[in-house]
Amino acid sequence: DKNLDMISGSIAHLVAATAKPVFYDAEHFFDGFRSDPGYALATLQCAVDAGASRVILCDTNGGVMPHELGHAIREVRKEIPGIKLGIHVHNDGGLGVANTLRAIEEGVVQIHGTINGIGERCGNVDLTSIIPNLELKLGYECVPEGRLKGLTNLSRIVWEYLNIQGPTGQPYVGPSAFAHKGGVHVSA
């Protein structure tokens, strides 16, 4: 198969040309897994056999549901034991954070994301949401102690640099995050 040969040749060339680890980004992996799981897994095995030290599973269209993502990752880990996985999700379905957290629960060791979720179409997973969830709710250490509060300022700097008003309701870092005002919610 030409595609498998191209994957193998590209990875082998990069491994031979550099002393650095080679990561394989499996673009459209979850779409491919949905339509042909065997072939999707074969592409990953091919990359690993050629020397890729890590495989990044990509939800390129941002359309996978968390339960589908979890199932696919479990199948990958079952079929290719010992594989080191990363995750790269888009937020087209509003599930970027949920899918990334699910991937971590399934053993993924690397996250691709951006500050404020900035990216093509509906964006990538927002690291200003992922990092606090990992630190505060799941017990991971992502940033040096005492630096978590700096995410709010970082978020604002990025929005300012882009000349965009950030959403007031942005989780963890938006001005309305954790603010309670009068009304039905407070009186309930």
Summary of predicted features, one role per range:
Residues 1-85, 101-108:
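Alpha/beta enzyme core
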Residues 25, 57-59, 86-90, 113-114, ...:
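Beta-strand segments within the central parallel beta-sheet cores of soluble alpha/beta enzyme folds
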Residues 57, 105-125:
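Glycine-rich phosphate-binding active-site loops on the catalytic face of alpha/beta enzymes
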Residues 93-98:
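Short glycine/serine/threonine-rich phosphate/pyrophosphate-binding segments
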Residues 100-104, 108, 128-135:
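Proline/glycine-anchored alpha-helix kink/cap motifs
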Residues 119-148:
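C-terminal helical cap(s) of enzyme catalytic domains, especially alpha/beta-barrels
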Residues 138-188:
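A mid-to-C-terminal "edge-of-domain" accessory segment
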